[in-house]
């Protein structure tokens, strides 16, 4: 079974109040469809980084986000993952202010996860830096996971 790393935007979109923006609302719906549809049969994993981020903000919403993640296997932050995350920041592929995003990418790469599921197209699933990021990760001895949104993972019969 393929593995999928759940990054913070997934529980955030799933549990968010109804959005007024059409784009945000469609992302919420796609996330809910994918999640409620059994996550398309993936073996889900997450990290303490995701749990920490999901626990921030409004206490009631944080409780919902953390509840959604309950029972999902948590990947350990290894020295290899920390080194790779620092390398992604040092190479300018992820800005220092977004270092937690580099941790998500590094954890999924080091732990050989197949997919990193995210709505973060600025620092994680950014097509403008994807190939440079892949090269940096490969040069570090790891394989970059496929970075995609829940919408991209919906089965044909689930597609919205």
Predicted regions and their residues:
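Active-site neighborhoods of divalent-metal-dependent phosphate/nucleic-acid chemistry enzymes
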Residues: 71-132, 154, 159
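C-terminal interaction segment
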Residues: 140-160
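C-terminal end-helix/capping segment
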Residues: 125-146
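Residues at the C-termini of beta-strands that transition into short coil/loop
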Residues: 48, 78, 148-151
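Short secondary-structure boundary segments
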Residues: 8, 48, 119-121
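Short, well-structured N-terminal submotif of metal-dependent ribonuclease cores
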Residues: 1-46, 55-66, 72, 90-95, ...
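A structural micro-motif
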Residues: 42, 72, 114, 143-145
